[in-house]
Amino acid sequence: MMIDIDHVSFQYSGAERENLQNFNLQIEKGECVVLTGESGCGKTCVTRLINTLIPHFYEGEMSGTVLIDGVDTRTIQPHDLSDKIGSVFQNPRSQFFSLDTDSEIVFGMENKGMPYQVMLDRYQQTIRELHIEKLKDRNLFDLSGGQKQTIAFASVYALNPDIFVLDEPSSNLDPEAIQELRRLLLLIKAQGKTIIVSEHRLYFLNGIADRIVLMEHGKLKQSWSASDFALLSTEQIKALGLRSYT
């Protein structure tokens, strides 16, 4: 089991109610799980459990356990899992540490003290495998929203984590950029990476997701395999408050 969230309840400091209530979710290695539901349902809270921002960055009251590849996240610091987990946030600018694309792609590797040749090899591999030659040596502030998202993804990809966590990655993207995001997700899916995506838009994840998890008021309301979810009619999906899957 790659990820095991066991009976977790969590309430942010200052929140009026629990943000997660007795939440359970198990994710196998190589599985792509999509968390969906209305804003405020707890999707982002789950992603923060997985990338260990909860409990180490966001304060609050937590019960239950979160195991990442068998390791209890309360017993280690986020940087100890940086080889295993990579995160792409809703607003890529929030995770940039550099002014140009090349520096941003290698930043995580530099921060880990990797040897120069290893960094160079991984940088070149990232550029080649993601097909982003046109984004080399660019000013980050000259890029479109979609291009910024691609660089944020590339900086994570260069570290070669086992788990990719993406929090509403399509929210600020146009249709063309969403298709580029889909291409990147298909790539890491084919590599056997474990993928967790918090999303309102679902159509671009058709053919990538293995499981769709609907959340409501901090609880897991319903879960489908991708094949079962694809059988739902447009009316059924709309009645659940979800967007089209096709």
Where are these regions (language model features)?
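Conserved ABC ATPase "signature" region
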Residues: 117-135
